[in-house]
UniProtKB/Swiss-Prot annotation:
Pfam family, one: Gag_p24
Role summary: Matrix protein p17 targets Gag and Gag-Pol polyproteins to the plasma membrane via a multipartite membrane binding signal, that includes its myristoylated N-terminus. Also mediates nuclear localization of the preintegration complex. Implicated in the release from host cell mediated by Vpu. Capsid protein p24 forms the conical core of the virus that encapsulates the genomic RNA-nucleocapsid complex.
Record's compositionally biased regions (Basic and acidic residues): 486-496
Motif (Nuclear export signal): 16-22
Zinc fingers classed as CCHC-type: ranges: 397-414, 418-435
Name recorded for this polypeptide: Gag polyprotein
Segments for region (Disordered): 113-138, 454-519
Lipidation (N-myristoyl glycine): G2
Species: Simian immunodeficiency virus agm.vervet (isolate AGM TYO-1)
PROSITE patterns: ZF_CCHC
Amino acid sequence: MGAATSALNRRQLDQFEKIRLRPNGKKKYQIKHLIWAGKEMERFGLHERLLETEEGCKRIIEVLYPLEPTGSEGLKSLFNLVCVLYCLHKEQKVKDTEEAVATVRQHCHLVEKEKSATETSSGQKKNDKGIAAPPGCSQNFPAQQQGNAWVHVPLSPRTLNAWVKAVEEKKFGAEIVPMFQALSEGCTPYDINQMLNVLGDHQGALQIVKEIINEEAAQWDVTHPLPAGPLPAGQLRDPRGSDIAGTTSSVQEQLEWIYTANPRVDVGAIYRRWIILGLQKCVKMYNPVSVLDIRQGPKEPFKDYVDRFYKAIRAEQASGEVKQWMTESLLIQNANPDCKVILKGLGMHPTLEEMLTACQGVGGPSYKAKVMAEMMQTMQNQNMVQQGGPKRQRPPLRCYNCGKFGHMQRQCPEPRKTKCLKCGKLGHLAKDCRGQVNFLGYGRWMGAKPRNFPAATLGAEPSAPPPPSGTTPYDPAKKLLQQYAEKGKQLREQKRNPPAMNPDWTEGYSLNSLFGEDQ
């Protein structure tokens, strides 16, 4: 877009920067949005100079409007931006994107066109120009006859949107090849190239498809050489490999080769086969798992295993006979042991319906419980064989209170008896038993012998002189006790007979000495 702002002049650019992205929002449009829109136009095969005029923006809106309801976030953003530019070129004052989209719907009559397109696809067989479609063909047929000439009708945006959405979701899975076959039925090389050009995120896969196209085109040139000498006047030339690929041929030449040439050369069908070969190679590259590696897990349901198996079979590039042999041999061979036992019991060449019905309960809760019960029974039988038979039976219960069999002490109806566990006598407990205790406190129930203490030496004499005869030995505690007794006796006597008060002391401390005769 040149300086990236050539789509708008200075006055329009000032108005553009005042329009809000959302109603009552803070963010507004900037120049970087125009630069982004110019780059996004190339993904849809549109020139960026269409943004510079009102008519160009209208054409962009007509292309993007059918894709907008189911398109990606980038496509919706581009559609909203083009609506804002259309209002600026139309000199319609808008405040935000939502108001601009509503204005475009009103001025371009998009709602009415959508209703008429729905009615036409449901029952009508004529387009807006009054051109009748060929018998047995819908309005999306890529070529329509007008008089004696064939007119090319481009692919519907809905078809392109369905193709792009399928590639984005499946990532060149096994479903892409039949999807391409359905959407490209009856298309010209120009239409097929348009379907490939709208894929922008898978250039590695498209490069593989281009290599296959170049190889097939070179092989076509070898097997179909040019005739010697110049062509007669008015005769259509034979298509070359590059003509079939749509690089050196026009749309009108492709229509003439398909419909009016003698002999006819269906360049669209030939180019379609080349694309399918390339897509099959891409599918094999994006799905490296071979059908030989598909095995049923120990807990996987048989239905899920069959789905994975046939998906891998679908991605295999082999003939129908080879796929049939792989299905008959590998489907049962790669099943888990439980399903394999059931499938082998069905006989030779069972149908898929019979196999699914027979293995329907394998892997479910009831089947797992049944298998677990059988395993536990088997393990129990093995343990009994290893242990050498059942264990010896225990003797009958005996009461410790009454000595009878058949019940325990806590269930005994007779009164509880107190019995010593040391001597075996009744009437006392073991802690009170003295019949088994000697003079040292050692009984039979103790775990060790009493310790030995050194005995006092007989005949040892004290070193101090003996006290005089007739006197008691000196005891300091006894003497101290006598002193305390005497002191207590004195205190009791003083309390009983307090001393008399001294008159001199009373006079010396009376108030008369302070005030004298004033009292």
